[in-house]
């Protein structure tokens, strides 16, 4: 039962630490190579939990499927042009971002 409580606590903490942020505030993380995108059809928190728990196989599978991706220069330029607002959560050393669905 403790592991369920710990997982629930982790979910609550990550939800509380997730926020909308403008692209211009994320550019330094992109420039440092620490920014990863999460596709709109994935759960940002689920992926953040996998990073937090060092679930390497799951992370590699998401990278292979494109559900998790390195933000391309073209995407970064588009977000800059649009002054995009993104969901973001920090899982050191990474910042995971996901486009805000409208």
PLM feature spans:
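Divalent-cation
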Residues: 19-22, 26, 57-59, 72, ...
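Generic serine detector
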Residues: 3, 39, 65-67, 72, ...
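Short, compact, well-ordered microdomains
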Residues: 69-102
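Generic secondary-structure microfeatures
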Residues: 40-42, 63-67, 93-95
């Amino acid at each position: 039962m403790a592991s369920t409580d710990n997982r629930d606590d982790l979910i609550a903490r990550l939800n509380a630490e997730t926020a909308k942020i403008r692209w211009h505030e994320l550019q330094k993380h992109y420039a440092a190579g620490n920014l990863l995108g999460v596709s709109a059809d994935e759960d940002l928190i689920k992926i953040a939990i996998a990073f937090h728990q060092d679930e390497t196989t799951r992370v590699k599978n998401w990278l292979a499927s494109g559900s998790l991706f390195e933000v391309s220069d073209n995407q970064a330029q588009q977000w800059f042009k649009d002054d995009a607002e993104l969901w973001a959560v920090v899982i050191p050393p990474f910042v995971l971002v996901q486009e805000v669905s409208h």
